From Swiss-Prot:
NADP(+) binds at residues 48-77. Changing A203V: In MPH; loss of testosterone 17-beta-dehydrogenase (NADP(+)) activity. GO terms for biological process: androgen biosynthetic process; male genitalia development; steroid biosynthetic process; testosterone biosynthetic process. The lineage of its organism: Eukaryota, Metazoa, Chordata, Craniata, Vertebrata. GO terms for cellular component: endoplasmic reticulum; endoplasmic reticulum membrane; intracellular membrane-bounded organelle. This is 17-beta-hydroxysteroid dehydrogenase type 3.
Length: 310
């Protein structure tokens, strides 16, 4: 019995060491890619002629649209506000010389995908950025006290990722080439009290993306999920930027350095460090009543001080 226990503890120790080593390797690769930018400039362009970006009217989606156009791709912008799309398209064409198509669609609805499919027909799509999403409550809130937007959130945060991937992945598979970036969130990495619906919806994006990567990596299609923490956008009420909170432009430029790093990344070095720190917090402490009270008092005060929330 003693020998069995000894072998068990040795094996457990080895597994823990391997897990720590894997995290160190991932972190080291992030540092290397961030500071030395070893991704060839032609890599993204080699995926195909067009990039499709959902939620392109603001924030991260808008930043991806500009950055991918700057890197040589034509872009398809999809969002619900036509005026924003037209203004962004004009600016991209003027500053980059790339071709731009716009598709007006409201991702909180589920009857939009035939229209999108028709508009995308015939395009050689090399990159899909599933960015569109909604956060019903920026301020932490108990589930029953949060805005009743459950169906809209499911359509926007979950259905959009599945349906857009279904539309475009089949063509990438046949071409044996493509890149799909699914924008999740750092709070998807473990359940977050007081952000229950948003956290759960983004956890779906993580699980779906990782499973697809395993299914299609032999087809030379890269499917990566990004799990950023704070990015200053309209959805986060333009949270004041700092060493952790990035502008959308900063986040996007850095995240594109990591597209070959693996199936999951936080998208920027600062957020990788934050994720590592949060993973050290014991579950009993994270899910304690004291932590929830901390969110409801100090974190709310921080948000009100550093955003346009009042």
């Amino acid at each position: 019995m003693g020998d069995v226990l000894e072998q068990f503890f040795i094996l457990t120790g080895l597994l823990v060491c391997l897990a720590c080593l894997a995290k160190c390797v991932r972190f080291s690769r992030c540092v290397l890619l961030n500071y030395w930018k070893v991704l060839p400039k032609s890599f993204l362009r080699s995926m195909g002629q067009w990039a499709v970006i959902t939620g392109a009217g603001d924030g991260i989606g808008k930043a991806y649209s500009f950055e991918l156009a700057k890197r040589g791709l034509n872009v398809v912008l999809i969002s619900r506000t036509l005026e924003k799309l037209e203004a962004i398209a004009t600016e991209i064409e003027r500053t980059t010389g790339r071709s731009v198509k716009i598709i007006q669609a409201d991702f909180t609805k589920d009857d939009i995908y035939e229209h999108i499919k028709e508009k995308l027909a015939g395009l050689e799509i090399g990159i899909l950025v599933n960015n569109v999403g909604m956060l019903p409550n920026l301020l932490p809130s108990h589930f029953l006290n949060a805005p009743d937007e459950i169906q809209s959130l499911i359509h926007c945060n979950i259905t959009s990722v599945v349906k857009m991937t279904q539309l475009i992945l089949k063509h990438m598979e046949s071409r044996q080439k493509g890149l799909i970036l699914n924008i999740s969130s750092g709070i998807a990495l473990f359940p977050w009290p007081l952000y229950s619906m948003y956290s759960a919806s983004k956890a779906f994006v993580c699980a779906f993306s990782k499973a697809l990567q395993e299914e299609y990596k032999a087809k030379e299609v890269i499917i990566q999920v990004l799990t950023p923490y704070a990015v200053s956008t309209a959805m986060t009420k333009y949270l004041n930027t700092n060493v952790i909170t990035k502008t959308a432009d900063e986040f996007v430029k850095e995240s594109l350095n990591y597209v070959t790093i693996g199936g999951e990344t936080c998208g920027c070095l600062a957020h990788e460090i934050l994720a590592g720190f949060l993973s050290l917090i014991p579950a009993w402490a994270f899910y304690s009543g004291a932590f929830q009270r901390l969110l409801l008092t100090h974190y709310v005060a921080y948000l009100k001080l550093n955003t346009k929330v009042r």
